[in-house]
Swiss-Prot record:
It comes from Zygosaccharomyces rouxii (strain ATCC 2623 / CBS 732 / NBRC 1130 / NCYC 568 / NRRL Y-229). Involved in gross chromosomal rearrangements (GCRs) and telomere healing. One of its GO terms (molecular function) is protein-macromolecule adaptor activity. The lineage of its organism: Eukaryota, Fungi, Dikarya, Ascomycota, Saccharomycotina. Keywords: Chromosomal rearrangement. It comes from the Eukaryota. This is Increased recombination centers protein 6.
Length: 237
């Protein structure tokens, strides 16, 4: 497990840890390029001063790269007290491997940290991924999401982003707690634009789950849309 020095409890949560089930460094470089749009050197384990940029903001982050032979052993080490300081400094944890239901997806109670499992098994279809995520979303404490690396489409049947576009959307809406963010677009609203996007995504997911087992007519769909609009504008009945 890689380590690096960390500072005080008020330190920025600007570290993203990516761990691979495949130890092939060339393959790791290719996937890092797909996920983050950057090129790293062979053998790089800690890359500092990277920039994540959206149309709303830019922020610097550090990328940590690791791999494992046995995920359970790696996860046990990651969950130990020895790596508590690293966990507190993390903006995100990304596992890149074939998804297996027996592997733990417990986010360890990480606060203000996204946890993504990037499934590399092409035999796992998007319908199965959506089903797994539906179950995860029903657990309020869960911050884990499964993303399919080999998705042939950019969106699912609900119009939600999937695959690599969904991964990038998750990073876009990261809270980046205590980070020095450079906002690129002025707005008359006191709500940050990326926070609004996160609220939209979460509200739509919750609405879909709420009505997953029932047929929605036009009136019900309109009501959901109105609720989302009122929530984002702060309008009350």
């Amino acid at each position: 497990m890689i380590m690096d020095s960390v500072s005080s409890p008020e330190q920025p949560k600007n570290k993203i840890l990516v761990t691979f089930g495949d130890g092939d460094s060339i393959h790791q470089r290719e996937l890092i390029s797909q996920l983050f749009g950057i090129d790293i050197g062979i053998g790089d384990r800690i890359v500092k001063g990277l920039v994540w940029k959206t149309k709303y903001y830019r922020v610097e982050f550090d990328l940590y790269i690791d791999d494992y032979n046995d995920f359970s052993s790696w996860f046990q080490e990651f969950a130990s007290e020895e790596f508590a300081a690293l966990r507190e400094a993390m903006a995100g944890l990304v596992v890149v491997d074939q998804y297996e239901p027996t592997k733990p997806l417990n986010p360890l109670g990480l606060q203000d940290t996204f946890v993504v499992w990037v499934n590399t098994d092409s035999k796992v279809g998007q319908d199965q991924v959506d089903e797994i995520n539906d179950k995860l979303f029903q657990t309020e404490e869960s911050t884990v999401e499964l993303v399919n690396l080999h998705s042939n489409e950019d969106t699912n049947e609900y119009g939600e982003k999937i695959g690599i576009p969904r991964f990038k959307e998750i990073v876009d809406t990261c809270s980046w707690k205590n980070c020095d963010m450079d906002y690129l677009t002025s707005t008359s609203s006191t709500t940050n634009p990326e926070v609004s996007l996160e609220l939209i995504v979460q509200r739509m997911q919750h609405a879909r789950l709420k009505h997953a087992n029932s047929e929605m007519d036009n009136d019900e769909a309109l009501q959901i849309a109105q609720e989302i609009a009122e929530e984002l504008t702060g309008k009350e009945d």
